[in-house]
Amino acid sequence: MGMILSGEVTSALTTFAGLGLALILEGDGAERVRLGWTDAAEPQMVVTADGYDDEAIAVAVHEHATARAVSGSWIDCNLQAAPWNGNSALFSPRVKAPQSLPQWRSLQTERLQRIDHEVEDKEQLKRDIDLELIGALGEPAYWRFANNGPRPDEGANRWEMKTRNRGEDFIRNRLRQLAQIVADRDASAIVSGLIGQSVKDEAYKGKRSDESRTATGLTSPRFTDSALAWCALWGISSFPVIHRLMGASVTAGAVPIGKFTPMHLVLPVLVGAHTLGRWQAVVVSEQVIQAATSRESAAAARSACAWLAAHGARATLTFHVNVSDNPNAPERSLGAGRLEALN
């Protein structure tokens, strides 16, 4: 049967968690990894792999987090030079902007040296999932300028939505924290969180559900299990960015295409067991956007829907991107998805 993940089809967190968990299992060396929604009135996300029951899946997640919680991992690396002085993670795509050419060169040198280290260290693995996430997150855009100056944040993945208040960044203040939390759990606690038997939100120290940001924008603020959030944030790896000289980098699933603050995320709903590669191909396709947005061209929408159906999709999900009114550190989060069956 496989692991049935906690969460509704109308929550982007559930799709991201399925994609992230599938990637983690492939990085563990699992064979025939599959994921998809059940064909039911209330669909559930199911992830399977040959020889992996719920406990084995949880062990893989635990080992994955433990390896990245250790000192010296890429998640543990900070930018050492000014203006960061060890207070920003090396691979966070949104950090304090460099103020000079030497600072930009320092940032690029540190990033490239560590990427080279990752490539050399992972040559024998079947799949280097770390580089997949690093690449998908994007990077500070040294090439982007506008009338009012540099725009380094335009090189970042739009689904990396950690608020930047108090100088916080995605990896140092979220991914690194979750790695340690999941590493400190045992397999049974990880299973419980992933399948929804319990919701343990160790990353949030308060008592009000509507103030927890553990989901990091993939849902509206609410209590979120840390293991589920860990998998979901690795799901960002399935949403690559394409950098552009003359505009903000394009992130898969973001609508309008190329807008710095998109209005919507569009996801496909694949029913049945599909490979991660199939999911990723559909996620980045123009057809998934056309099916959800081609109001002016019925022919284009029909063609897109036919293509999606041929690739396993039954519907699309459209999520509104909510943005707070804080001008200094605007908070983005995804609302509930609008499910639309393919015509």
Where are these regions (language model features)?
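Short linear interaction motifs
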Residues: 155-157, 190-218, 234-247
